[in-house]
Amino acid sequence: MRLALWMYQGTAHHGVGRIANSMRGVHAVFHAPQGDDYVNPIFTMLERTPDFPRMTTSIVSGRDLAQGTVRLPETLRQVDAQVQPDLIIVCASCSTILLQEDLERMAHSAGTRAETLVYDANPYRMQEVRSADGLFTLLTQRFARSQPPTAVPSVNILGPASLGFHNRSDLICLRRMLATLGVQVNVVAPLGASIRDLERLPAAWATIAPYRELGQNAARWLDEQFGVPALTDSPIGVQPTLRWLRRLVETLNDAGERLQRLTNPLRLPPLTAFSLDGMSAPSSVPWFARTADMESYSMKRAFVFGDATHTVGMVKFLRDELGMQIVGAGTYLEHEADWVRGELQDYLPADETGSIDTSFLVTEVFQDVARRIADLTPELVCGTQMERHACRKLDLPCMVIAPPTHIENHLLSYRPVLGFDGADVLADTVYTTATLGMEKHLIDMFGDAGLEYEEPRTERREAEFGNQKVETGEPGTGAPVIAHADSNGGVAGSSSTLAAQTVTASPRLVTPVWAPEAQAMLKKVPFFVRGRVQKNVERYAAQHGYATITAEILVEAKEALGG
């Protein structure tokens, strides 16, 4: 297990907490030291619900270990008496699992009324996503019972969960589309489900599981054990939603014929029936993408990074429906990397061998993603909360499309990602996130009108080489500084000469600086590509041994780079 400042996934017992907090009549008890009770505040901070998190930490202290005492049985009895759950899930945290204690024996000795399940959420083998999905699959296998099918077409919706990315809004959107088709919802799980609801899962005609991260393994098991077909596509975007609806109708008609329960086959109603007012088009994306504003996006470059479901869905939405260029994508879910790579094979830039490995990134290290973004400098980044932080430093527009997220992505309002409504939300977010730039263009042309906008930071940049930092601009002034290494390995500066120079010291220790006339030319470049032009010219100057970038070198670099 790797420790870091930021991690894309929570620990294994955080995944257990997500399932317990999603369900009714289920409570999680963590056998953990005081420091591992951070999971509770995460839910109280982010989850917009009036209830307390359905989890309790049974503290393990150094005194307990020294005296050979265990608090877990007493904690289980207290939870059983006060909360009165139907099921208590017990698991060790990433710290106490090192003790290798017999939690089964401890839980059995508590003698609780509620059923107790000890879940082996080993943090050295799994993290949040696999832990949550594994637990939900286990609960499905444990409690699902053979049931007669419902009298009318019905579906299960598996996957929405506590702290899921816009899951509550997605659920509303799915319910609306199903109601339009005349299809009932049998069970939604884990969000809002009880143990009794899990028993009723086999009664549905089909199962909808739109998220690869949670619910699809349980859906496949229901198909294998009870013959309930699973629909695992993610309706992200207008065209994927249309395909999803057609496949759902086909699946339910096949199930109805097999079950001999359907007298009149289901049919898709007019598309206007799926709109909010019942009279207009269900989504505005098809016509909006052809407006003058959005057609300009066909020249914009995008980078997408996140979990499996939202990365694939967002890449296809940006390219297929908004016409943007995808310069790179990736995921932090290593166990889903092969599926994501296969889905994006025709969407990412390939090398001469046809491989997309150079443009596809699989990593759990957020610094690697930040470096890739800095190298590509796209006009739009779609990522997680970590990419949002990285892009703020790089002054690049970023929209959050996948967990991990912060409080602003757990909204009270209706903001789905799935379905026709989700397509409109995504298009709006892209449009309001990507920079149009009219304000900055006007400031460049007419001045700031006394508003004191900051100048683009072209004359002061820091370059870090190993443990050394080279200041390439005088703080608070526009005077460029020629940086070079002194005899002791330090860095000295001089602003005396602005002519082009050949670097005689190690090129690793010198960053080219901009002469005033070159800076003036750079400011004439539209701001939304200015950063990329600056970086390319600086790279060209460093490769050719120029310590100072003059107007002549800027023109030379532009011609050499094909600009």
UniProtKB/Swiss-Prot annotation:
Cofactor binding comment, as recorded: Binds 1 [4Fe-4S] cluster per heterodimer. The cluster is bound at the heterodimer interface by residues from both subunits.
InterPro entries, alphabetized: ChlB/BchB/BchZ, LI-POR_suB-like_C, Nase/OxRdtase_comp1, P-CP_red_C, Protochl_reductB, Protochlorophyllide_Rdtase
Listed cofactors: [4Fe-4S] cluster
Keywords from the named record: 4Fe-4S, ATP-binding, Bacteriochlorophyll biosynthesis, Chlorophyll biosynthesis, Iron, Iron-sulfur, Metal-binding, Nucleotide-binding, Oxidoreductase, Photosynthesis
Region (Disordered), start-end ranges: 459-478
Coiled coil (UniProt feature): none
Binding site for substrate: G437, M438
GO MF terms held by the record: 4 iron, 4 sulfur cluster binding; ATP binding; metal ion binding; oxidoreductase activity, acting on iron-sulfur proteins as donors; oxidoreductase activity, acting on the CH-CH group of donors, iron-sulfur protein as acceptor
Binding site for [4Fe-4S] cluster: D36
Pfam families: Oxidored_nitro, PCP_red
Record-annotated disulphide pairs: none
Active site: D293
A single BP term in Gene Ontology: photosynthesis, dark reaction
EC number: 1.3.7.7
Pathway(s) where this gene product acts: Porphyrin-containing compound metabolism; bacteriochlorophyll biosynthesis (light-independent)
Catalytic activity: chlorophyllide a + oxidized 2[4Fe-4S]-[ferredoxin] + 2 ADP + 2 phosphate = protochlorophyllide a + reduced 2[4Fe-4S]-[ferredoxin] + 2 ATP + 2 H2O
NCBIfam families per record: DPOR_BchB (TIGR01278), PRK02910.1-3 (NF002789)
HAMAP family, A to Z: ChlB_BchB
Family designation: Belongs to the ChlB/BchB/BchZ family.
Functional summary from the UniProt entry: Component of the dark-operative protochlorophyllide reductase (DPOR) that uses Mg-ATP and reduced ferredoxin to reduce ring D of protochlorophyllide (Pchlide) to form chlorophyllide a (Chlide). This reaction is light-independent. The NB-protein (BchN-BchB) is the catalytic component of the complex.
Subunit structure and binding partners: Protochlorophyllide reductase is composed of three subunits; BchL, BchN and BchB. Forms a heterotetramer of two BchB and two BchN subunits.
Designated name of the protein: Light-independent protochlorophyllide reductase subunit B
Lineage start: Bacteria, Bacillati, Chloroflexota, Chloroflexia, Chloroflexales
